[in-house]
Curated annotation (Swiss-Prot):
One of its GO terms (cellular component) is endoplasmic reticulum membrane. SUPFAM superfamilies: Cytochrome P450. The keyword Iron applies. Heme binds at C443. Its main location: endoplasmic reticulum. Its EC number is 1.14.14.1. GO terms for molecular function: heme binding; iron ion binding; oxidoreductase activity, acting on paired donors, with incorporation or reduction of molecular oxygen, reduced flavin or flavoprotein as one donor, and incorporation of one atom of oxygen; steroid hydroxylase activity. This is Cytochrome P450 3A40. Its cofactor is heme. PANTHER family: CYTOCHROME P450 FAMILY 3, CYTOCHROME P450, FAMILY 3, SUBFAMILY A, POLYPEPTIDE 65. It is an enzyme of class 1 (oxidoreductase). It comes from Oryzias latipes (Japanese rice fish).
Amino acid sequence: MGNFLYFSAETWTLLVAFITLLLVYAYWPYGTFKRLGIPGPKPVPFFGTMLAYRKGFFNFDDECRKKYGKTWGIYDGRQPVLCITDPATIKAVLVKECYSLFTNRRNFRLNGPLYDAVSIAEDDQWKRIRSVLSPSFTSGRLKEMFDIMKHHSANLIQSMKKKVDKDEPLEMKEYFGPYSMDVVTSTAFSVDIDSLNNPSDPFVTNIKKMLKFDFLNPLFLAVAFFPFLGPILEKFEFSLFPSSVMDFFFAALRKIKANHENNKQKSRIDFLQLMIDSQKNNQNGLQDKGLSDHEILSQAMIFIFAGYETTSSSLTFLAYNLATNPEVMKKLQKEIDATFPNKAPVQYVPLMEMEYLDCVVNESLRLYPIAARLERVAKATVEVNGLVIPKDMVVMVPTWPLHRDPELWPEPEKFKPERFSKENKDTFDPYTYMPFGAGPRNCIGMRFALVMMKLAVVEILQTYDFSVCKETEVPFEMDVQGFLAPKRPIQLKLTPRSASSS
């Protein structure tokens, strides 16, 4: 203690200067929204408002919407984030000014080998990659893939039957996860891993490791507190994603890509083959058109990641909603029986024309949106509907509170598919319902995910009823870490329709 008191004048000066600079650094960004006249929760040094994420970012967003109205400001570490729920402003950001001012999503860096994935890439690179991928998701292409999907949905039903025969509850994610994985790998790479019958398949175990993301991860916090560290850590190949998982998937995808390139007799065109063809069509020197080897691997990886998690989670929530709303399930089964009498094989066109099925899926996605937050970054300072948005500001649309706003959706907590009927569709603004995002940068796999979901639920309901059991948590508690998911697995029973009908 004595040594501390007898520091030299120069040491004291440096110490005071350091503390002053640290305090300035800690507090400097937190006047942004006050200067703009935008309300919001009070930030704390370095963390900003991130400590509130401990209650779940969706709960935090909901609290802010109720307290501050349609517009508010939060801080992810030192990064100001402008939150908007006004439909006109949302349309301007996501659609009207997408290409000119709000092209890019927020980039946390530390993406490892996924730096050039379509969901992360920016500006011209993103446009080029998106244009190459888009043909993979047309209605015509999905129709070609439908029989492959049906092969795996049949496996799903057969796998579920084993539990039904034992009169045991089913942990829904343990079935919908492998189903999603099998469909994605089959339609994307012509590879059949059959994870439904091989739950310990490394594709499944590794994807689960990747999904264990914590917003209070020390590496994530370091970049949030000190953004200048991002490029430095990236140079040293630090990543928010487990390196062992990335190494596994990229090694596997390299082998699959090599097999595609060496296979002279291509039985079918898949997602990977379309990307490889973009390279071959590009050999005339127009290097700005096709994808590089690394870009191909990154898109394949992000397709596995997004296809597995979003579809399996959405199917799990949908099954829960049907089990807890049996009158909706019975009405849906009537439509299924009318469309495919006597358990007739499900066909693509009539499936996609089922109106009540569409309402049911939309309502489930309203309650549990795939994309709970949509983000864009302003390229320049701009005024949108009277709201000044400074350059480099992150603009965020919180879909969870938007989808559950009682002013927009009467009785928002209730599962009411009729909200999306033809008669009611004109009663709400399309920019108040965005489970897959909106505009040019929406989810590219939206139609693919919807086909997978509709096929699975229709084939299950042709034979079974979803029902709650003693293991079912009603209502279930949401997990507050990472992605939108229940805290504990959702368990339901499947009851043969003949038994339940009688």
